[in-house]
Amino acid sequence: MASHEQALILEPAGELRFKGPFTDVVTADLKLSNPTDRRICFKVKTTAPKRYCVRPNSGILEPKTSIAVAVMLQPFNYDPNEKNKHKFMVQSMYAPDHVVESQELLWKDAPPESLMDTKLRCVFEMPDGSHQAPASDASRATDAGAHFSESALEDPTVASRKTETQSPKRVGAVGSAGEDVKKLQHELKKAQSEITSLKGENSQLKDEGIRLRKVAMTDTVSPTPLNPSPAPAAAVRAFPPVVYVVAAIILGLIIGKFLL
């Protein structure tokens, strides 16, 4: 897979030891050192990504510097008769001279001949001194064909919740969630009450608006005074000349008859 010897110095160089009991997260430290004058990109992979958390699991090492990598084994039921076949691989390559904007793309586009790698075995040890035997020769022979995937980068505090000792925290979290639901329900009822109140006020405002419009219409019609007295007076003033004319005609006819 790689055509170059590993440029990084790994401590430990051949295996990672995890000391039990394994009822909680167990951490093994891995130190990576860059003795060269060039920047080196590194990535940590494993054949069991669901069983481990690695922080950091990738990065760039400046010349003449080192970094401590924490490899965290998640809690599990330890069986001393079961052979451990977990493997880790530290993969590296020289970083380009330009600024690396995306390490993911850098690894994706890297030619295979530029990659360097070192494989590490995992060994489980119990406090009494007995430890699980490393992988057999047959399993070592298949190391080259083992499937390595990047270890999931998780917060150790999140991983530790999987243990039974953390169950009270889960109960507390559930209780807190229940209180949050009650608060939300109370706020919802309060909001619904406010909406109902606003609807009532809106209805009152509509009724008031209709009443004001009616009053305005009444005021618009009423300015013309309905005083019937002037009209009859005008009629009285208009009628006398007509009466006089008629009376004069009648009087003329009577006088005419007498004269004839």
UniProtKB/Swiss-Prot annotation:
Gene Ontology molecular function: FFAT motif binding
Signal peptide: none
Residues in MSP domain copies: 7-125
Membrane-crossing segments per the record: 239-259
Alphabetized InterPro entries for the sequence: Ig-like_fold (IPR013783), MSP_dom (IPR000535), PapD-like_sf (IPR008962), VAP (IPR016763)
One Pfam family here: Motile_Sperm
GO CC annotation: endoplasmic reticulum membrane; neuron projection; plasma membrane; synapse
Entries under PROSITE patterns matching the protein: MSP
Chief site of localization: membrane
Keywords linked to the UniProt accession: Coiled coil, Membrane, Synapse, Synaptosome, Transmembrane, Transmembrane helix
GO biological process terms held by the UniProt record: endoplasmic reticulum membrane organization; endoplasmic reticulum-plasma membrane tethering
Cytoplasmic side, ranges: 1-238
Protein name, as recorded: Vesicle-associated membrane protein/synaptobrevin-binding protein
Species of the source: Aplysia californica
